[in-house]
Amino acid sequence: MDCFCKSVRQDILRISRHSGHGHIPTCFSVVEMLAAVYSEMKHNPADPSWDERDIFILSKGHAALAHYCTLAHSGYFPVKDVYNFGAFSSIFGCHADRHRVPGVELSTGSLGHGSCVAAGIALALKIKKSPRKVYVLIGDGESNEGTVWESLMVAAHQKLDNLTVLLDHNKSQIRCLPITRPADKFRAFDCETVEVEGHNVNALRAALSAPANGKPKVIVADTVKGWGCRTLAENMFAWHRRSPSKEEMEMLLGELK
Protein backbone atom coordinates (compact mmCIF):
# COMPACT_ATOMS: atom_id res chain seq x y z
CA MET A 1 0.00 0.00 0.00
CA ASP A 2 2.91 2.40 0.61
CA CYS A 3 3.98 1.99 -3.02
CA PHE A 4 0.37 2.54 -4.18
CA CYS A 5 0.07 5.76 -2.18
CA LYS A 6 3.45 7.06 -3.32
CA SER A 7 2.54 6.39 -6.96
CA VAL A 8 -0.76 8.24 -6.54
CA ARG A 9 1.05 11.25 -5.05
CA GLN A 10 3.64 11.22 -7.84
CA ASP A 11 0.87 11.33 -10.42
CA ILE A 12 -0.98 14.11 -8.59
CA LEU A 13 2.17 16.24 -8.75
CA ARG A 14 2.95 15.45 -12.38
CA ILE A 15 -0.62 15.95 -13.57
CA SER A 16 -0.97 19.21 -11.65
CA ARG A 17 2.26 20.44 -13.21
CA HIS A 18 1.12 19.35 -16.70
CA SER A 19 -2.40 20.77 -16.43
CA GLY A 20 -1.88 23.83 -14.25
CA HIS A 21 -4.79 22.72 -12.05
CA GLY A 22 -5.35 20.86 -8.81
CA HIS A 23 -5.55 21.28 -5.03
CA ILE A 24 -2.35 19.39 -4.23
CA PRO A 25 -2.24 19.65 -0.39
CA THR A 26 -5.87 18.58 0.09
CA CYS A 27 -5.40 15.77 -2.43
CA PHE A 28 -2.39 14.54 -0.47
CA SER A 29 -4.35 14.47 2.80
CA VAL A 30 -6.88 11.91 1.46
CA VAL A 31 -4.58 9.48 -0.40
CA GLU A 32 -4.43 6.83 2.34
CA MET A 33 -8.18 7.05 2.96
CA LEU A 34 -8.89 6.45 -0.72
CA ALA A 35 -6.42 3.56 -0.82
CA ALA A 36 -8.03 1.96 2.25
CA VAL A 37 -11.59 2.33 0.94
CA TYR A 38 -10.79 0.88 -2.47
CA SER A 39 -8.99 -2.06 -0.86
CA GLU A 40 -12.00 -2.83 1.36
CA MET A 41 -15.06 -2.07 -0.76
CA LYS A 42 -16.57 -4.34 -3.40
CA HIS A 43 -15.99 -2.86 -6.84
CA ASN A 44 -15.16 -3.97 -10.36
CA PRO A 45 -12.99 -1.72 -12.57
CA ALA A 46 -13.96 -3.82 -15.60
CA ASP A 47 -17.65 -3.12 -14.88
CA PRO A 48 -18.02 0.17 -12.95
CA SER A 49 -21.82 -0.18 -12.96
CA TRP A 50 -21.76 -3.71 -11.50
CA ASP A 51 -25.04 -4.23 -9.63
CA GLU A 52 -23.36 -5.71 -6.54
CA ARG A 53 -20.78 -2.95 -6.09
CA ASP A 54 -20.42 -0.86 -2.97
CA ILE A 55 -20.78 2.90 -3.41
CA PHE A 56 -18.08 5.50 -2.74
CA ILE A 57 -18.76 9.25 -2.84
CA LEU A 58 -16.06 11.91 -2.60
CA SER A 59 -18.01 14.79 -1.09
CA LYS A 60 -15.01 17.14 -0.86
CA GLY A 61 -14.98 17.43 -4.63
CA HIS A 62 -11.91 19.68 -4.84
CA ALA A 63 -9.82 16.54 -4.14
CA ALA A 64 -11.04 15.06 -7.45
CA LEU A 65 -7.50 14.66 -8.81
CA ALA A 66 -6.64 12.29 -5.94
CA HIS A 67 -9.78 10.29 -6.72
CA TYR A 68 -8.96 10.09 -10.44
CA CYS A 69 -5.42 8.88 -9.71
CA THR A 70 -6.73 6.29 -7.25
CA LEU A 71 -9.25 5.05 -9.83
CA ALA A 72 -6.53 4.90 -12.48
CA HIS A 73 -4.20 2.88 -10.25
CA SER A 74 -7.15 0.62 -9.39
CA GLY A 75 -7.64 -0.22 -13.07
CA TYR A 76 -10.59 1.95 -14.16
CA PHE A 77 -8.65 3.76 -16.90
CA PRO A 78 -5.00 4.45 -17.81
CA VAL A 79 -3.15 7.06 -15.77
CA LYS A 80 -2.08 8.79 -19.00
CA ASP A 81 -5.73 9.69 -19.67
CA VAL A 82 -5.83 11.82 -16.52
CA TYR A 83 -3.10 14.11 -17.88
CA ASN A 84 -5.95 15.94 -19.67
CA PHE A 85 -7.21 16.97 -16.20
CA GLY A 86 -8.99 20.31 -16.30
CA ALA A 87 -8.80 20.72 -20.09
CA PHE A 88 -11.92 22.01 -21.84
CA SER A 89 -12.41 18.78 -23.81
CA SER A 90 -11.44 16.42 -20.96
CA ILE A 91 -13.80 14.13 -19.07
CA PHE A 92 -11.58 14.73 -16.02
CA GLY A 93 -12.88 18.06 -14.76
CA CYS A 94 -11.55 19.88 -11.71
CA HIS A 95 -14.72 18.52 -10.08
CA ALA A 96 -15.87 15.05 -11.08
CA ASP A 97 -18.81 14.31 -13.39
CA ARG A 98 -20.53 11.00 -12.70
CA HIS A 99 -21.89 10.87 -16.25
CA ARG A 100 -18.41 10.95 -17.76
CA VAL A 101 -15.85 9.35 -15.43
CA PRO A 102 -15.99 5.58 -14.79
CA GLY A 103 -16.13 4.85 -11.07
CA VAL A 104 -17.49 8.25 -10.03
CA GLU A 105 -20.89 7.86 -8.36
CA LEU A 106 -21.80 11.51 -7.72
CA SER A 107 -20.93 14.83 -9.33
CA THR A 108 -19.62 16.93 -6.45
CA GLY A 109 -18.20 20.36 -5.84
CA SER A 110 -20.78 22.19 -3.74
CA LEU A 111 -19.84 21.03 -0.25
CA GLY A 112 -22.27 19.34 2.13
CA HIS A 113 -24.22 17.32 -0.42
CA GLY A 114 -22.30 14.04 -0.49
CA SER A 115 -23.35 12.84 2.96
CA CYS A 116 -27.01 13.54 2.12
CA VAL A 117 -26.91 11.51 -1.09
CA ALA A 118 -24.94 8.76 0.64
CA ALA A 119 -27.54 8.51 3.42
CA GLY A 120 -30.32 8.32 0.83
CA ILE A 121 -28.58 5.54 -1.09
CA ALA A 122 -27.85 3.66 2.15
CA LEU A 123 -31.51 3.91 3.16
CA ALA A 124 -32.66 2.62 -0.23
CA LEU A 125 -30.25 -0.32 0.01
CA LYS A 126 -31.42 -1.05 3.56
CA ILE A 127 -35.07 -1.10 2.42
CA LYS A 128 -34.10 -3.52 -0.36
CA LYS A 129 -32.24 -5.67 2.21
CA SER A 130 -29.13 -5.37 0.04
CA PRO A 131 -25.73 -6.27 1.54
CA ARG A 132 -24.07 -3.41 -0.36
CA LYS A 133 -22.33 -0.66 1.59
CA VAL A 134 -21.97 3.09 1.11
CA TYR A 135 -18.88 5.14 1.88
CA VAL A 136 -18.57 8.93 1.79
CA LEU A 137 -15.48 11.05 2.38
CA ILE A 138 -16.08 14.55 3.75
CA GLY A 139 -13.82 17.41 4.83
CA ASP A 140 -13.67 19.05 8.24
CA GLY A 141 -14.35 22.48 6.74
CA GLU A 142 -17.29 20.94 4.92
CA SER A 143 -18.66 19.94 8.31
CA ASN A 144 -19.67 23.56 8.86
CA GLU A 145 -22.52 22.78 6.48
CA GLY A 146 -25.73 21.97 8.35
CA THR A 147 -26.66 19.38 5.74
CA VAL A 148 -23.87 17.12 7.02
CA TRP A 149 -25.46 16.97 10.47
CA GLU A 150 -29.00 16.68 9.12
CA SER A 151 -27.97 13.66 7.05
CA LEU A 152 -26.36 12.07 10.11
CA MET A 153 -29.54 12.61 12.12
CA VAL A 154 -31.47 10.73 9.44
CA ALA A 155 -28.81 8.01 9.20
CA ALA A 156 -28.79 7.45 12.96
CA HIS A 157 -32.59 7.46 13.18
CA GLN A 158 -32.80 4.89 10.38
CA LYS A 159 -29.95 2.82 11.90
CA LEU A 160 -27.99 2.86 8.65
CA ASP A 161 -25.16 0.56 9.66
CA ASN A 162 -24.37 0.14 5.95
CA LEU A 163 -23.13 3.76 5.81
CA THR A 164 -19.56 4.81 6.64
CA VAL A 165 -18.53 8.46 6.75
CA LEU A 166 -14.81 9.25 6.62
CA LEU A 167 -13.81 12.69 7.92
CA ASP A 168 -10.60 14.19 6.54
CA HIS A 169 -9.65 16.04 9.71
CA ASN A 170 -6.69 17.98 8.29
CA LYS A 171 -7.50 20.99 10.47
CA SER A 172 -6.87 23.65 7.84
CA GLN A 173 -10.34 24.96 8.71
CA ILE A 174 -8.82 26.26 11.95
CA ARG A 175 -8.24 29.58 10.14
CA CYS A 176 -12.00 30.22 10.16
CA LEU A 177 -14.47 28.31 12.34
CA PRO A 178 -12.69 25.20 13.65
CA ILE A 179 -14.58 21.95 14.21
CA THR A 180 -13.28 21.12 17.68
CA ARG A 181 -13.46 17.59 19.11
CA PRO A 182 -15.33 16.24 16.06
CA ALA A 183 -15.50 12.68 17.41
CA ASP A 184 -17.53 13.88 20.41
CA LYS A 185 -19.98 15.59 18.08
CA PHE A 186 -20.46 12.50 15.93
CA ARG A 187 -20.99 10.35 19.02
CA ALA A 188 -23.60 12.85 20.22
CA PHE A 189 -25.43 12.19 16.94
CA ASP A 190 -25.48 8.47 17.86
CA CYS A 191 -22.89 7.39 15.30
CA GLU A 192 -20.41 4.56 15.87
CA THR A 193 -17.28 6.71 15.89
CA VAL A 194 -13.65 5.64 15.49
CA GLU A 195 -10.60 7.90 15.65
CA VAL A 196 -7.57 6.83 13.61
CA GLU A 197 -4.27 8.10 12.25
CA GLY A 198 -5.37 9.12 8.78
CA HIS A 199 -2.14 8.24 6.98
CA ASN A 200 -1.98 4.67 8.32
CA VAL A 201 -3.67 2.44 5.74
CA ASN A 202 -3.77 -0.59 8.04
CA ALA A 203 -5.46 1.41 10.82
CA LEU A 204 -7.96 2.80 8.33
CA ARG A 205 -8.75 -0.66 6.96
CA ALA A 206 -9.26 -2.00 10.49
CA ALA A 207 -11.66 0.86 11.21
CA LEU A 208 -13.54 0.25 7.96
CA SER A 209 -14.02 -3.44 8.76
CA ALA A 210 -14.89 -2.95 12.46
CA PRO A 211 -18.51 -3.65 13.53
CA ALA A 212 -20.92 -0.74 13.21
CA ASN A 213 -23.16 -2.03 16.03
CA GLY A 214 -26.38 -1.11 14.27
CA LYS A 215 -25.37 2.52 13.70
CA PRO A 216 -23.89 4.63 10.91
CA LYS A 217 -20.12 4.60 11.29
CA VAL A 218 -17.91 7.69 11.29
CA ILE A 219 -14.14 7.40 10.96
CA VAL A 220 -12.39 10.57 12.13
CA ALA A 221 -9.07 10.43 10.29
CA ASP A 222 -6.39 12.68 11.78
CA THR A 223 -4.55 13.93 8.70
CA VAL A 224 -2.03 16.54 7.59
CA LYS A 225 -2.71 18.68 4.55
CA GLY A 226 0.18 18.06 2.16
CA TRP A 227 1.25 14.85 3.93
CA GLY A 228 4.11 13.07 2.16
CA CYS A 229 6.01 16.23 1.18
CA ARG A 230 7.63 18.35 3.88
CA THR A 231 7.42 21.52 1.78
CA LEU A 232 3.69 21.09 1.18
CA ALA A 233 2.88 20.15 4.77
CA GLU A 234 4.81 23.10 6.20
CA ASN A 235 3.48 25.63 3.67
CA MET A 236 0.01 24.26 2.90
CA PHE A 237 -1.69 27.64 2.59
CA ALA A 238 0.94 28.95 0.17
CA TRP A 239 0.21 25.96 -2.07
CA HIS A 240 -3.57 26.34 -2.05
CA ARG A 241 -4.77 25.94 -5.66
CA ARG A 242 -1.20 26.34 -6.91
CA SER A 243 0.58 24.11 -9.41
CA PRO A 244 4.35 23.59 -9.22
CA SER A 245 6.93 24.81 -11.68
CA LYS A 246 9.14 22.16 -13.28
CA GLU A 247 11.85 22.78 -10.69
CA GLU A 248 9.37 22.72 -7.81
CA MET A 249 7.83 19.49 -9.08
CA GLU A 250 11.24 17.79 -9.14
CA MET A 251 11.93 19.03 -5.60
CA LEU A 252 8.56 17.76 -4.34
CA LEU A 253 8.98 14.40 -6.07
CA GLY A 254 12.33 14.06 -4.33
CA GLU A 255 10.71 14.73 -0.94
CA LEU A 256 7.95 12.14 -1.35
CA LYS A 257 7.81 9.49 1.35
Each language-model region and where it sits:
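Short catalytic-loop micro-motif centered on adjacent basic/acidic residues
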Residues: 24, 136-138, 193-197
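Cofactor-binding active-site loop characterized by glycine-rich and histidine/acidic residues
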Residues: 12-15, 27-157
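Glycine/aspartate-rich loop-and-adjacent alpha/beta segment that forms the canonical ThDP
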Residues: 201, 205-257
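Conserved thiamine diphosphate
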Residues: 130, 178-207
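Short, small-residue-enriched loops and turns at beta-alpha junctions
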Residues: 171-176, 227
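N-terminal capping segment at the start of a domain
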Residues: 5-21, 167-169
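Generic beta-sheet signal
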Residues: 54-56, 132-136, 163, 213-223
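A short alpha/beta connector and helix-capping loop motif
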Residues: 145-170, 218-221
